[in-house]
Structures are given as C-alpha cells and as structure tokens.
Amino acid sequence: MKAYLDLMRHVLDNGTDKSDRTGTGTLSVFGYQMRFDLGKGFPLLTTKKLHLRSIIHELLWFLKGDTNIKYLKDNNVSIWDDEWADENGDLGPVYGYQWRSWPAPDGRHIDQIANVVEQIKKNPDSRRLIVSAWNPALVDEMALPPCHALFQFYVADGNLSCQLYQRSADIFLGVPFNIASYALLTMMMAQVCGLEAGEFVHTFGDAHLYRNHFEQAALQLEREPRALPVMKINPEVKDLFAFKFEDFELEGYDPHPHIKAVVSV
C-alpha cells in the first residue's frame, strides 16, 4: 500500500491550508489518482489495522438499497452512527437509494447496479458502465452528500476494472475504507459476470488530511507496509445481491496496530 502512503506524504508536503464544513481545518490537494492491481493482493491497509467487518457489512448494506442504520447497528457497525441518522435511524436518500432506486422524472425507479451488471454481461465494451450516487435534486435531503460520488467499470482481456471518482476524501480515516470497499465490489462484480478482477483506480477531487490527524499520519508514515492479504470469495455465489457476510474470508492479514483518530463531523 505504498500508493496510499505516497498520497499522505504528498498532501503533507504540498497541501494547501483550507477551512472546511466541520471547522477542523485541513491540508488539501485537488486531483490525485492511485491504482491497485487486484491480482497482487487485496488492498487492505497494513500500516494500521482496519475493521474489515465494518467494510463488508457497509457494502452489503449499500447493495441492499438500505438507508436505515438498523442493519448496521444490528451487526455492530458504527460507521453511520446516530449523529448522522434521524430519530428513526434514517439517513435520507443516500448511497443505497441512489444505487438501487434512482428516481426518474416519469416516476420510475432505476436500479443502477442491476443495470450495470446486465450491461457488463451483454455489452462489456460499453463506455456507459457507470453508477452515480450524486443526485443534485436530493443532495439536501441526505444526511451526508455522497463523498464517493461516481464509479465506472471497464472490461478488457477478461478482466473487470473499476474507477471511482471521490469528490471529498478524508485521507486518514475514510480513504482506507473506500479503497477496500470498492476493491471488494470490483471482485464481487467480476465473479458474478464471469470475469477476473483487474484494477481498482481511485481518483480524487479534494483529498485532505484533517489537522487533528497530523500526528497519526506521521506515525503511520514511520511504519513499513507489509504483504497484502488475500480475499477469498465463495465461488458458488453468482448473484450480486445474494452475497452474505459469511461468503468472504481474508487470509494473511498481518497489519501494524490500530491508530485511533477522531471523526470530523
């Protein structure tokens, strides 16, 4: 995961001081890209321990089209805890709703994920293999507008690759989760479409380090990356919406210890 440490170092060396919505303050750069070859291991950060259980459950929650935190809380996942949700646990029309039930002007609801699976199978050379979570008409109704806003798939030589555009990226806390989540989604999509996983390409708009994460970032940069783990996925699952938590097994994960940091809200 040298690419991730390079991003962190680049922002510390070249970032611009910016104010932000949370009042914390950041060092920020605009426009940056990382690439991960999924054939060389699962890109789960090794310079600090990550909670893979949360990453998997959140992705399954997105794919269900769910926007209530009950499923997450039932599975001890606190990514979208009560400070984001209303009194009923609802987050508004966030990721899952846009992915699975994008509202069209004529009253239809478009399942972008199902559509893109169908198109990958039927027309793999299409340049329209895109899913968007950024719906300008509904942004103000969301607990948090989508940070990972749009992703596109690409098929070449039997390999499926994915590029994510992330408009806003909390480098220390959020980005490691985003890398693992979209890498896993790419692997799942590849399996159900009869392809191999290719690359995950991570493109950023505003990539930033919060000021209250500088010490943690410095500690992480002192650590040497270790060998990437391997993600095993149940090969019997051929329906993207049939995956369960038990269908995933991580092998060979040997990270450095966890580093605590405060989320800026």
From Swiss-Prot:
<feature type="active site" description="Nucleophile">
    <location>
        <position position="147"/>
    </location>
</feature>
<dbReference type="GO" id="GO:0005829">
    <property type="term" value="C:cytosol"/>
</dbReference>
<feature type="binding site">
    <location>
        <position position="51"/>
    </location>
    <ligand>
        <name>(6R)-5,10-methylene-5,6,7,8-tetrahydrofolate</name>
    </ligand>
</feature>
<dbReference type="GO" id="GO:0032259">
    <property type="term" value="P:methylation"/>
</dbReference>
<keyword id="KW-0489">Methyltransferase</keyword>
<comment type="pathway">
    <text>Pyrimidine metabolism; dTTP biosynthesis.</text>
</comment>
<feature type="binding site">
    <location>
        <begin position="127"/>
        <end position="128"/>
    </location>
    <ligand>
        <name>dUMP</name>
    </ligand>
</feature>
<dbReference type="InterPro" id="IPR020940">
    <property type="entry name" value="Thymidylate_synthase_AS"/>
</dbReference>
<keyword id="KW-0963">Cytoplasm</keyword>
<feature type="binding site" description="in other chain">
    <location>
        <begin position="167"/>
        <end position="170"/>
    </location>
    <ligand>
        <name>dUMP</name>
    </ligand>
</feature>
<feature type="binding site">
    <location>
        <position position="170"/>
    </location>
    <ligand>
        <name>(6R)-5,10-methylene-5,6,7,8-tetrahydrofolate</name>
    </ligand>
</feature>
<feature type="binding site" description="in other chain">
    <location>
        <position position="21"/>
    </location>
    <ligand>
        <name>dUMP</name>
    </ligand>
</feature>
<protein>
    <recommendedName>
        <fullName>Thymidylate synthase</fullName>
        <ecNumber>2.1.1.45</ecNumber>
    </recommendedName>
</protein>
<dbReference type="GO" id="GO:0006231">
    <property type="term" value="P:dTMP biosynthetic process"/>
</dbReference>
<keyword id="KW-0808">Transferase</keyword>
<feature type="binding site" description="in other chain">
    <location>
        <position position="178"/>
    </location>
    <ligand>
        <name>dUMP</name>
    </ligand>
</feature>
<keyword id="KW-0545">Nucleotide biosynthesis</keyword>
<dbReference type="InterPro" id="IPR023451">
    <property type="entry name" value="Thymidate_synth/dCMP_Mease_dom"/>
</dbReference>
<comment type="subunit">
    <text>Homodimer.</text>
</comment>
<dbReference type="Pfam" id="PF00303">
    <property type="entry name" value="Thymidylat_synt"/>
</dbReference>
<comment type="similarity">
    <text>Belongs to the thymidylate synthase family. Bacterial-type ThyA subfamily.</text>
</comment>
<dbReference type="GO" id="GO:0006235">
    <property type="term" value="P:dTTP biosynthetic process"/>
</dbReference>
<dbReference type="InterPro" id="IPR045097">
    <property type="entry name" value="Thymidate_synth/dCMP_Mease"/>
</dbReference>
<dbReference type="InterPro" id="IPR000398">
    <property type="entry name" value="Thymidylate_synthase"/>
</dbReference>
<feature type="binding site" description="in other chain">
    <location>
        <begin position="208"/>
        <end position="210"/>
    </location>
    <ligand>
        <name>dUMP</name>
    </ligand>
</feature>
<dbReference type="InterPro" id="IPR036926">
    <property type="entry name" value="Thymidate_synth/dCMP_Mease_sf"/>
</dbReference>
<feature type="binding site">
    <location>
        <position position="264"/>
    </location>
    <ligand>
        <name>(6R)-5,10-methylene-5,6,7,8-tetrahydrofolate</name>
    </ligand>
</feature>
<dbReference type="GO" id="GO:0004799">
    <property type="term" value="F:thymidylate synthase activity"/>
</dbReference>
<comment type="function">
    <text>Catalyzes the reductive methylation of 2'-deoxyuridine-5'-monophosphate (dUMP) to 2'-deoxythymidine-5'-monophosphate (dTMP) while utilizing 5,10-methylenetetrahydrofolate (mTHF) as the methyl donor and reductant in the reaction, yielding dihydrofolate (DHF) as a by-product. This enzymatic reaction provides an intracellular de novo source of dTMP, an essential precursor for DNA biosynthesis.</text>
</comment>
